[in-house]
Amino acid sequence: MSKMKDFGGGRDIISDLPDALIGHILSFLPTIEAVATTVLAKRWKPLLSFVHSLDFDDSLCLHPAKTNEEKRTNATSFMRFVDGVLALQGNARINKFRLNGKHIINERWVLDWIQNVLKRDVSDIRLYVSSCSDGFDSSFYHLPPEIFVSQTLVTLIIMFEGDINISVGREVSLPKLKTLHLYHFKIKLSTFNKLISGCHALEELMMINWKWDESSEPEPCFVTIYLPNLKILEYCRFERYDEANDKVSLLFHNPKVVYLEFFDSIADRYQQVSFGSLVEARLGIRLTYDQVYNHLETEYYVSSKEKSNVTNLLTGICNVKILYLSDETLEVFGCCRDTIPVFSNLIELTIQTKPHIIWKPLPAMLNNCPNLITLIFEGMHHIYSDRCEDEDGCLCRYPTNFVGGVVARPCLSSSPVKVLKILNFGEICDVHEDDEDDDDDDDDEDEEFVYCLRE
């Protein structure tokens, strides 16, 4: 009993712990809360040097601001706070540096912070930075080249809405890097190849909303993604710069990838597409503005070379089991439905529909999925055309036999599909309505549809 009383008798037990252990405990708190402990006693202030994980979030630090001047003052205060913590820690080793900054007024400060933590053998960098700049055409900030020769980095996630220009030195060496996420960036094709070739251990690669830097590039341009340990790949290029793909030849050879997201225009050439272990893929192939412009009625023009390119891409992923096709991909399939390969392993297919998309390629796709079990439609929208008056030309129209009975479509009656799901069932789509309003309506419709299924 005496020991129990000694243990809980109002003593400051935490302060009796070793400094390194206290620092480890503080590392699990948001950094602003860890810093707040320095007011407890003089002894606590130097303990910040033992905090090996820094987590800065300006939403936890800033007071609500009404005017732009107040917002700027708050943002400056937050950035000085980060500066102060880094200075207080000196050269102490750090494992993780995370920054969630929605009101950053000067991205160059952030680049300085990156250099600071790189010198301290950081293994995990995660930056989510919103910018005050006006869109994607703003000046591109250069990441410090030291970041691409780090011998300790395991995770690197950088999302700069103010845009990043990636340039590297003579070599790229990231021997321990397993996770790389890059958002809103510009890069030369030669630099991209050098970056990928220096990440031999990479297991997860995400590249979102980015563009090719076309300056001083030879033609044709070859882009190679060969990562033997890669398991997750998201390759989503910025739509506004589709013309830069006209001279790009892509090579994908990733035998261990199980999940793929690919959103891009049709490349000049798919030299090789190999995903031997692919389980799930989300595909968003889109037509360029020139291809859309050269349309005839509801058929869009693509050359025989572009048709072949699409076929090569699809052949490289045709062993997939779960596939999502965007509405734009369905549009592209309409131009090359006669060359769609067989998806022999596909068991679940999701189709996104929009009011401006035709369904003509869908029968060809279904006929090439011999083991399909689940078919999912995101909405039931399609464009109205002259073919909708033709019983043999529109998938959504029920043909009738000579006695007036309804006959199932051959592509549906011969399909092995056992489960049909329709998301947003009964949705009335008005292309003039705001997306936010549509989303609200979708929620209600989904709930009503689920209720009907349970009945």
Swiss-Prot record:
The keyword Repeat applies. Coiled coil: none annotated. The lineage of its organism: Eukaryota, Viridiplantae, Streptophyta, Embryophyta, Tracheophyta. Pfam families: F-box, LRR_At5g56370. Keywords: Leucine-rich repeat, Repeat. LRR repeats lie at residues 14-39, 157-184, 190-209, 211-237, 322-353, 354-379, 396-424. InterPro entries: F-box-like_dom_sf (IPR036047), F-box_AtFBL13-like (IPR053781), F-box_dom (IPR001810), FBL60-like (IPR055294), LRR_dom_sf (IPR032675), LRR_FXL15/At3g58940/PEG3-like (IPR055411). This is Putative F-box/LRR-repeat protein At5g41630. Residues 11-59 form the F-box domain.
